[in-house]
């Protein structure tokens, strides 16, 4: 061990800094043991004066399905912590009652503590967007032991696919836990100070923060019990949404299934297209022309030569034939999806995985080109297999996987255009598996490596209760649009007109126009290329469609 790795420095503002041994002399683990109060009322006043839009990071409405983990500190094996949702809420449906016990038996030089920790992976919060601070509702009582410590967890060296807890920045409030009644705590980002890092001068970089901790610290080293109520941890921004442009849908997805083929009520495609044109929608994107999910043995057009399901297994439900005939009669445009395949998430670094998908798409593209290359309504190709920017359960963040994906997209697009030279579309899902700026860089690298893809419609994920439309989407749209422009790909948005939630459980349903309107408003500030997923939840007679009809007519 070098002298550098043994270094112990006295740091007056924070107490002792200890440099712990790490893998190299460049990566020194700096650890401040002191507990200085960091409350700054002037900074709090500034946040309050400039706060505009906010985002809920954690609502504490439900104990089950939560994203955070409760535990005792590594040095606090005799302490205890538990929590449950209670109806005594300041916002929303519930609040979290945190019960804790101190035994005054720390096994290190640090005080005993209990903690709640949340690490962001997919669907993450990005604190760098018009940043001011955090807010948190807290209800304490005068008998509570301990002080409040909020930590931001950062990796200044974060790379796609890799994030490590390299830095902690702490905010300390020594009185809030003893205050009776609900108190709204404002925590300016400038009140966070380095607690642990790689170097004494590490700075808070909000774009590299990927989680937080809420600690209760036994500063006085006394035994005791307490209860604290928490509600509505929020990201506070200075961003004020302004919808200067009035957006319109120009196209819409349709997911084919046997119901549309077997039920006569769905035969009148001419009427559907006519109704769509009345509200400015003149294009449909058929998500896939073969298979998908439980209906993987179906070709949705006649004359299919698909053979990978086995002889006599593949069947035909030629809805596309009817759609193309109706489109020609009504002057409608159809973009045809290819094979309804999916990536093998366990083999994303294996070229053979992509070769199999390519071979199947070549068969489908060949079939469709023979039937529709000269059809006046055939407007383009859509590569059906859906990719994303996600971190887990598997994705393409690492360079080798990203390059295999870009090579695959290039091969499919190039082959399709060789059969019929029409524009090629893709529609990746925005899973927010990286901070917004890094996500934009990742899309930029992918698209610059990809040839013959003309349009990218970004799925907004607004139908899955996983995104804040006002905060998350503007942040990511800005960076990803820039990536598209620099790569020569046209940027569009794919708005989800459905809604469902895993937790709390909400069954799949169509959105109302009131729910859908803001998604459209946000997207329209970044592009005129706005599509809708999908016809199943946005069709004549539905509130979403009829509300949009009224909105569209009001723009004339």
Set out the residue ranges of the language-model regions:
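C-terminal motif of bacterial Sec signal peptides marking the signal peptidase cleavage site
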Residues: 19-22
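Beta-rich carbohydrate-recognition modules and glycan-binding surfaces
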Residues: 27-245
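Boundary/entry segment of secreted carbohydrate-active catalytic domains
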Residues: 43-48, 54-64, 236-290, 430
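Aromatic-lined substrate-binding rim segments of carbohydrate-active enzymes
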Residues: 266-343, 399-426, 470-483
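Substrate-binding cleft of secreted/luminal carbohydrate-active enzymes
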Residues: 284, 379, 457-469, 479, ...
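An active-site-proximal structural segment forming one wall of the substrate-binding cleft
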Residues: 315-330, 350-380, 415, 443-450, ...
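Aromatic-lined carbohydrate-recognition surfaces of secreted/lumenal glycan-active proteins
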Residues: 335-347, 355, 380-386, 408-440, ...
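Active-site groove signature of glycoside hydrolases
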Residues: 340-341, 364-399, 531
């Amino acid at each position: 061990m070098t002298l550098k790795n043994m270094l112990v420095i006295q740091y007056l503002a924070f107490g002792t800094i200890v440099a712990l041994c790490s893998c190299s002399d460049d990566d020194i683990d700096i650890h401040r043991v002191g507990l200085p109060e960091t409350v700054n009322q002037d900074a709090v006043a500034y946040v309050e004066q400039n706060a505009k839009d906010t985002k809920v990071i954690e609502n504490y409405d439900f104990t089950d399905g939560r994203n955070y983990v409760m535990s005792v500190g590594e040095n606090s094996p005799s302490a205890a912590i538990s929590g449950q949702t209670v109806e005594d809420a300041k916002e929303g449906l519930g609040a979290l009652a945190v019960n804790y016990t101190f035994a005054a038996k720390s096994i290190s030089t640090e005080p005993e503590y209990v903690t709640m920790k949340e690490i962001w992976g997919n669907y993450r919060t990005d604190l760098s967007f018009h940043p001011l601070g955090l807010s948190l509702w807290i209800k304490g009582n005068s008998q509570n032991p301990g002080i409040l410590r909020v930590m931001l967890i950062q990796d200044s060296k974060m790379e796609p696919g890799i994030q490590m807890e390299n830095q902690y920045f702490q905010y300390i409030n020594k009185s809030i836990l003893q205050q009776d009644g609900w108190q709204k705590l404002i925590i300016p980002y400038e009140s966070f100070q380095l607690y642990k890092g790689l170097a004494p001068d590490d700075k808070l970089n909000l774009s590299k923060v990927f989680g937080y901790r809420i600690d209760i610290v036994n500063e006085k080293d006394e035994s005791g019990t307490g209860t604290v109520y928490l509600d509505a941890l929020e990201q506070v921004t200075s961003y004020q949404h302004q919808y200067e442009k009035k957006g319109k849908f120009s196209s819409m997805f349709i997911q084919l299934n046997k119901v549309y083929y077997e039920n006569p009520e769905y035969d009148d495609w001419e009427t559907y297209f006519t109704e769509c044109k009345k509200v400015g929608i003149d294009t449909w994107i058929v998500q896939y022309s073969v298979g998908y999910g439980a209906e993987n043995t179906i070709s949705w057009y006649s004359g299919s030569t698909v053979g990978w399901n086995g002889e006599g297994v593949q069947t035909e439900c030629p809805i596309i034939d009817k759609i193309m005939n109706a489109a020609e009669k009504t002057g409608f445009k159809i973009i045809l999806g290819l094979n309804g395949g999916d990536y093998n998430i366990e083999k994303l670094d294996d070229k053979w995985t992509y070769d199999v998908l390519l071979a199947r798409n070549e068969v489908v593209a060949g079939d469709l080109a023979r039937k529709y290359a000269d059809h006046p309504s055939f407007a383009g190709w859509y590569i059906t297999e859906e990719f994303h920017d996600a971190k887990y359960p598997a994705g393409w963040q690492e360079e080798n996987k990203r390059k295999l994906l870009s090579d695959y997209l290039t091969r499919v697009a190039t082959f399709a255009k060789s059969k019929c030279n029409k524009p090629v579309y893709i529609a990746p899902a925005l899973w927010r598996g990286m901070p917004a700026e890094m996500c934009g860089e990742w899309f930029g690298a992918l698209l610059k490596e990809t040839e013959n893809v003309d349009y990218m419609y970004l799925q907004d994920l607004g139908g899955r209760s996983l995104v804040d439309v006002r905060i998350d989407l503007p942040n990511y749209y800005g960076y990803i649009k820039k990536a598209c422009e620099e790569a020569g790909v046209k940027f569009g948005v794919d708005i989800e007109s459905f809604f469902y939630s895993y937790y709390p459980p909400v069954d799949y349903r169509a959105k109302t126009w009131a729910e859908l309107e803001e998604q459209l408003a946000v997207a329209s500030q970044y592009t005129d290329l706005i599509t809708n997923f999908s016809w199943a939840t946005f069709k004549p007679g539905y509130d979403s469609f009829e509300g949009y009809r009224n909105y569209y007519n009001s723009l004339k």
